[in-house]
Amino acid sequence: MSSHADSNPWTVPALAQAKRAGRKLVMLTAYDASFARTFDVNGVDLILVGDSLGMVMQGHDSTLAVTTADMVYHTAAVARALDRALLVADLSFQADATPERALDAATQLLQAGAEMVKIEGAGHKLEVIRYLVEREIPVCSHLGLTPQSVLRFGGYKVQGRGEAGEQLRRDAQAVVDAGASLVVLECVPTPIATQISAELSVPTIGIGAGPGCDGQVLVMHDMLGLDSGHRRPKFVKDFLAEGGSVAGAVRAYAQAVRDGSFPDAEHAYAA
C-alpha cells in the first residue's frame, strides 16, 4: 500500500492522495510545543489545535468560552514544533458567525502557523466555507456532534441516527461542494459514517464514528488516559497503558489507526 514518506511534510493535496491510496490518516490534538513535537516525530499526520483546550487546558465545562486570542496563542506554540504534521486550528465559538468575522479569525490563525481551519456545522456555514476557500484558506468541516452546539443538542449525544443520518449525508456533500478539503465526523453511528466516507471525494476523520472513516482523531488527554474532569466518552481508548510512555502511546495509537484495529466495535456507535 502506498504511504506518505515520513520525511515529507503533509500538505492539503496530500490528504486526498492518501484517501485514494487507502492510507489511514492519524490525527491528535495538541496545545503546546512539547507534546506537538513528540506527536510529530512519532507518526502523527495531522495536529489539531482544538477549542477543546477550553475543557482540557482551561477547565471549562464546554468549548464556548474559548476566544480567537486563545486559539492564536496555542496555534503559534504548536506550529513552532512541527516539521511534518499538517496543522489544523479551530475557529472558536461565533468566530465564524459571518464570512467577514471568519476571514479575520482564520487570517490570524494562518499567520500563527495553521495550514487549515476547522469550522463546525453546515447550513449557513456553507457560505463561510466558500468565502474562505475563495480566499485561499483551506477548510476542514466538522459535522455530527459539534461541541459548539452543545446547548442546542442538550448535551453531548450521538448524532445522525434514523432520518438524521440522511441529513448528515447531505450536509457532508454540501460542505465538500462548498470547498472543504477534510471532514471530521464526531459521534456518528458507524454505518452512516462509513457510507459518508465512501461517498465523499475528500478524507473523513472520525472521532466516535467507527473504523470506516479515512482517519481518526482523539483529544490527546483522552488518548493518554488523563482525567480531564469530564465523563469519558465511549470512543476513547487509553493508549498510554499499552505504550508505556507518551511516545510509545502515540506510536501505538498511530499503528492501531493505520492497521484498522482502532476503533473497534467497543469504541464506536451502532446504528
Swiss-Prot record:
Gene Ontology terms, MF aspect: 3-methyl-2-oxobutanoate hydroxymethyltransferase activity; magnesium ion binding
Pathway: Cofactor biosynthesis; (R)-pantothenate biosynthesis; (R)-pantoate from 3-methyl-2-oxobutanoate: step 1/2
Free-text cofactor note: Binds 1 Mg(2+) ion per subunit.
GO cellular component labels: cytoplasm
One matching Pfam family: Pantoate_transf
Cofactors: Mg(2+)
InterPro entries, sorted: Pantoate_hydroxy_MeTrfase, Pyrv/PenolPyrv_kinase-like_dom, Pyrv_kinase-like_dom_sf
CDD domains: KPHMT-like (cd06557)
PANTHER family: 3-METHYL-2-OXOBUTANOATE HYDROXYMETHYLTRANSFERASE (PTHR20881:SF0)
Family: Belongs to the PanB family.
Protein name according to UniProt: 3-methyl-2-oxobutanoate hydroxymethyltransferase
Organism of origin: Xanthomonas oryzae pv. oryzae (strain KACC10331 / KXO85)
